[in-house]
Every structure is written in structure tokens, then in C-alpha cells.
Amino acid sequence: DRSVSRGLGDVYKRQAYVQWMKEETARKHISEVAVMFDQPYKEPDCEIITTNDIDVSETDTAVYVIARNSGEGADRFDEEGDYRLYPHEKGNIHLLAEVYDKLIVVLNIGGVMDLSEMKSIEGVNAILLMTQLGNLGGDALLDVLIGKVNPSGKTTDTWAKNYMDYPSSAKFSHNESVHDEMYEDGIYVGYRYFDSFGVKPLYCFGYGKSYTDFEIKAGKISVEGNEIQIPVTVKNTGKIYTGKEVVQVYYSATGGVMEKPYQELAVYQKTKLLAPGETEEIVLKYQAEQMASYSEKEAAWILEKGDYIIRVGNSSASTKVAGVIEVCEDIQTLKAKNLFALDVALNEIHPDAVKLEEKKKEEIYDTLLSYKIPCLVFCRALKPDDMLLQTNLLMLSYFVP
């Protein structure tokens, strides 16, 4: 029972509070609200599908929906019925996969969950992430299932193969029953951790399939003032479905003193609806200051000297090097102030720095074998009130087939 009257803390005080609420709602003739206190929400039990249920079905396709609730003030748990499947859910999926020619599993959830076992079940043809779309979500879901609308969404989280692949999983509060949680992930949050530490996820950040295929080609990168511009041509190479693609631009910072992850998302943009064979040219833009790192020593954001590798693709794990921007010297982009100094030092996680630098540059070496790299030098056109140093130069290297 998760009602307020039986929650944590002083039971009598909480019961008195609820009693007052009941009296108040009764006085105002709002009986439905009072009933809610007597009957708090409880997750429904998973229904077991039987062969009798299947016998009345005359279709060759089954759609099985897995639901998980989400909300504020409630941690997720690595347990059945939350992060993991209920035993009944596993049994239902196995049965449906054996009986039906096609099985689609829909995830009506607000966060990640363990899909490794589900992916291993032979006969699961598709997994559709519906998330929580609101009161009209059913209409949107049906449009996608029948092909009226082509899905074009991308994952905003990294879906791990195993719960323990998440860096905080071993020390999260409910695992050790601690009162204080030491945040030791540092800058390695989400895909930054998986990419930098070489942990292969089940589904990477920015992942999402379509009923059609797309070809993404990056053009000549340019720099205007502080703005980096990446022209990209996107073509629907499929023959049946129209669709949209999300082009993603990442950068890898190399050669600096401050620690940096393997790559970070700089900008993304969704195309218009493209018919089979149709092409669209878009220009993705972002400010160079976005690539700066915070220095506690200087109490400032610094765009460090070094190479900044620009990668273009449709997910964090599917990109190609489009060019390299060389920053010739350190640039202070914003002066700040250190606040809330730590009372206890954090033992933050760190990847192998040497291997990480090699990984960042690995794709460049492969690209150099087949591409010529002309170098252009750009002088920043800065406003007087711009905090960047006006004497700095950006040297741009771009790849031309």
C-alpha cells in the first residue's frame, strides 16, 4: 500500500493529514478525491496469455505491449517488473513468438529497461519504443504500426546490454543502503561513458530505425566568425516509403590538457519528409564555444589548443569523419566563478587516456589514405564585447573525395 496514510515517517501525523483531506473533500462534495486516498494507484498485475486466448485470434500478427510507470521521487530498480521483465512477460513473449508469424513488442515506458533477453527470443520481429505519448498516443502508435507514418525518432538514452554496464549501478543508493551518494561519473555521462570506456551498448545514443534507408554525405565545412557550418546532403535511397532522417554532428577533442570524452553531440537536425530517391541539402550550425571545457583552475570555460574532429552520421555509433578543426591556441570563452567546493574529494572514473586519444584519431588515419586534405585558415570576426581573444586563428581541414 503506497498511500500517504501508510508511508514513511510519523504514521499518526500522516493519518491525521489524510483524515483532514477526506473531511475536506466530503465537505466540498468531491467524493471521488476521497476515494483516491482509500484506493491508491497500484501497478496492475501482468496478465498471463493462454492458448485459449490465442485460439480466438484469426491473425498472423501479434502486438504485445510492455508498460512501466514513471514519475518524480521514485528511483528505478534492477528487479522484475521494473528494469527487468516479469516472468509472466517472458512467458507471454515466448508463447506469442511460437504461435504467430510476426510479433511486435511495443514499449510503453518512460525510461530504459533490460531488452537483452527479449532480443534473444527467436520470433520477435520488431521492438517499437512508444515511450509515454499522452492521451492520443494510441492513434500515433497505430499510424506507425500500419505504415501510415514512418518512424523517425532517435534514442535519447544509451540502452545497456547489462544493468551493471552503467557506471553508477554498483554504488547506487538502494544497492548499498547508503545515506550519501558520491557522484563519481564526472564528465562521463550516458554515451560519453560507453564511447570513452569501450563498453558496447545494446542500443547506442541517437539510434533509431526507419522503414526506408538514407544516405548521408557531408560537404565542405566552413567557419564564419564563431559559427561552424557543416553542409550535409541526405538522400532517401529506399524504393517504397517516404521518411525523415535525423542528421547528427559530433566532435572529438584531441591534444588538450583537460580530460575530454571520446565524442560529444554538437548539433542535430531532422530532414523534411523525403520521398524515395528524393534529396535534401541542409546546413547544421553550432558555435565553437560549445566545444570548450570548464577549468576549475582558471574558473573559466576554455577552448583548448588542439584538433577537433568533426563526425557526421545518424547515431553516436554510426558516423564518418567530415573534417578537422585546429585551434591554434587556448581561447577563454567565458570567465566564471567556482562555487560549492567539495568537502570530500571525489574518486571520479577515468578511462585509459592513451587508448582514448588513439581511438579518437583512428578513423582520421583511415580517411587520410583515401582523401586529400586541403587546409584553410580563418581569422575570427569577433565583436568587441566577445570574450574570445581576437587574435586567435582557426585552421580548418576538410575532406574532399
Language model segments and positions:
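Intrinsically disordered, low-complexity Ser/Thr/Gly-rich stretches
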Residues: 198-200, 204-365, 372-373
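Intrinsically disordered, low-complexity regulatory regions in eukaryotic proteins
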Residues: 334-335, 342, 361-401
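Short beta-alpha connecting loops at secondary-structure transitions
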Residues: 81, 123-131, 167-168, 172-177, ...
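Hydrophobic anchor at the start of a short beta-strand
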Residues: 10, 101-104
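Sec-exported extracytoplasmic/periplasmic mature domains
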Residues: 67, 97-101, 146-150
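Secreted, periplasmic, or luminal enzymes acting at the cell surface/secretory milieu
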Residues: 13-41, 108-244, 250, 305, ...
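Hydrophobic helix-and-loop "lid/oligomerization" segment in the mid-to-C-terminal part
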Residues: 20-97, 105-122
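Single conserved hydrophobic/aromatic residue that forms the stacking wall/gate
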Residues: 1-12
